[in-house]
Structure formats: structure tokens, C-alpha cells
A protein has these predicted regions:
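Extended catalytic cores of very large enzyme megasubunits
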Residues: 1-288
Length: 288
């Protein structure tokens, strides 16, 4: 299926100089896959070749592709003529509740990706913290309340239909007002699980105890800049900044925050650490 699908693309765009070269590529690819010398990612298995081999087109699902002839972005007219073969996507989210690109729209965009077996990661640092003022009056319910909605949405979707669950990464900058709650999110949920298990509920991951609590459908990471480590070395205070106006909402000891990150990672394997400054220093396409 995969080999034939790739062969169709090779013929369509004349990637090889001769038919013999194309046949050699096909034969070597099929041999390599059958002997597990190389295998593609999961979405390739799920999606690629369904149209070419079985004639399955599927309804359009809001995907886009770049036409190689015109170099223009076009909306896909079916699900599998231009399938979703990539394993990982990065989505942004605006500090907006219901408009396109905002929080509720993100769950729809994630669902589209999960449906075809791919994973998604998002940095949620743009969303204002609990208690920050809203433009229409009142104050924000905070980031954590929305993360729990996204967690439930991801848990309701088994990526790829019947093959795998949603793959989801949640990132947060270390100066977000709710960083401490985020760091300890899974720690607190694991305490609830332990209490439920002690009360007689099964301990397996698909059991009622884990289905009851939140935070079980993503891997979480904190974005750590170099200036945090400088503050840590100096045993200084770390400022948590409002997303709406940049003011300092709270000050915590850098060492205390670092200790909580390490304890949480030991206790429940989250959050991971992403070294923001170093990652961007090594960025090969900083203007991209």
C-alpha cells in the first residue's frame, strides 16, 4: 500500500529519470519495509495509500496542501487523496475564548489532527492567568481551567480511529502566573488516584480511578530560559508575569520553584524541561 502510493507520486511528478530507476526505488523500498530495515511513522500506515490502492477518498476535513505546480495553498477536497502523513504538529493558541485561533477553536484543530493518528504540541503561555482582567469586565478563570477541558477532549478521542490515543504535549513558560499549579497538576491528581485505589478502585490505566482525574492525556513541559538559572545561582526571586500587561503578579524563590519541578518530575514523570534559550540559540532557521 505504501509503496504503491509513493510510486503514484513518483510517476505523477517524474521524480526519476527513467522507469527503471523508479522501479528500483519501489523494489528497494518494499524490501526495506518488509524486512523492517526502515518503516514509516504511524500516520503513514493509517492514511497513505488508502486512496491509491482502495479508492477511499473520504470527506474533506479542513486540511490544506501546497500544489507543487502552482505553489499555491489549496483546500483539500477529500481526506485521503492528500492524506495527513506527518506524525507531529505544532499549533499556536490566542488568548481568545471562541474566535478562530482561540482556546475553543484549538480543541477542534487538535481533534482534526488526532483523528488521523498524529500528535500535537502547543505552548499555552499566551493565555492569561487566573484573576487577570478581561476586556469585557470581570476576571479570567485561568489557564488551568482550560487545560482540563483540552485534557478531557483528548481523552475522548482515540487517535487513528482504533489504533492509538491522542498524543498531546502541553508547554508553559516558566514566568506564567499559574506555573506552580501547572508544575504540580499531575502530582495532585496522582494523590487522588492513590486515594481511589486505596478505596478499592482498579489501578490499571484504563480503570475508573485514572478516568476520574484530569491531566492524564498529555505530557507536560516547562520552558526554562537561561536567566532563570542565573537567578537560581544567585538564590534570587523569580517573577511571574501577567499575560495582559506584563506586570509582576507574584514573586517566588527560584530555588523553591526548581525544587517543585524536580519533585514533580520524580513523583509522576512530569513536567519535562525545555531549555528555551539553548533551543533558540541552536535554531537553524531563526527567521522562519
Amino acid at each position: 500500500k505504501l509503496g504503491l502510493a509513493l510510486n503514484c507520486e513518483i510517476e505523477r511528478y517524474n521524480y526519476f529519470a527513467t522507469e527503471n530507476d523508479a522501479q528500483i526505488f519501489y523494489d528497494e523500498l518494499v524490501y526495506s519495509i518488509l524486512n523492517q530495515a526502515c518503516v514509516p511513522n504511524s500516520p503513514q500506515w493509517f492514511n497513505t495509500g488508502l486512496y491509491e490502492v482502495y479508492g477511499i477518498a473520504g470527506k474533506p476535513q479542513g486540511h490544506y496542501f501546497v500544489d507543487p505546480k502552482s505553489n499555491l495553498l489549496q483546500r483539500s477536497t477529500s481526506a485521503y487523496e492528500r492524506p495527513q502523513p506527518h506524525a507531529c504538529f505544532i499549533l499556536s493558541v490566542d488568548d481568545d475564548l471562541v474566535n478562530e485561533g482561540g482556546i475553543m477553536d484549538l480543541w477542534v484543530r487538535e481533534a482534526r489532527i488526532f483523528k488521523y493518528g498524529s500528535g500535537v504540541g502547543t505552548n499555552y503561555s499566551s493565555i492569561r492567568g487566573e484573576g487577570e482582567k478581561l476586556s469585557g469586565g470581570g476576571s479570567s478563570s485561568g489557564l488551568m481551567s482550560f487545560l482540563k477541558i483540552g485534557d478531557r477532549a483528548a481523552g475522548a478521542i482515540k487517535s487513528g480511529g482504533t489504533t492509538r490515543r491522542a498524543a498531546k504535549m502541553v508547554c508553559l513558560d516558566l514566568d506564567h502566573p499559574e506555573i506552580i499549579d501547572f508544575v504540580n497538576w499531575k502530582v495532585e491528581e496522582e494523590k487522588k488516584v492513590a486515594a481511589l485505589i486505596a478505596a478499592g478502585y482498579p489501578s490499571d490505566y484504563e480503570g475508573e480511578a485514572y478516568r476520574t482525574v484530569s491531566g492524564q492525556n498529555s505530557n507536560n513541559s516547562v520552558r526554562v530560559p537561561n536567566n532563570f538559572f542565573k537567578t537560581l545561582d544567585e538564590n534570587g526571586d523569580w517573577e511571574l508575569k501577567a499575560r495582559s500587561d506584563g506586570r509582576t503578579m507574584k514573586t517566588v524563590k527560584a530555588q523553591a520553584l526548581w525544587d517543585q519541578i524536580n519533585y514533580a518530575a520524580w513523583r509522576c514523570a512530569d513536567p519535562g524541561t525545555q531549555y528555551d534559550t539553548t533551543i533558540n540559540e541552536w535554531h537553524t532557521c531563526p527567521e522562519g
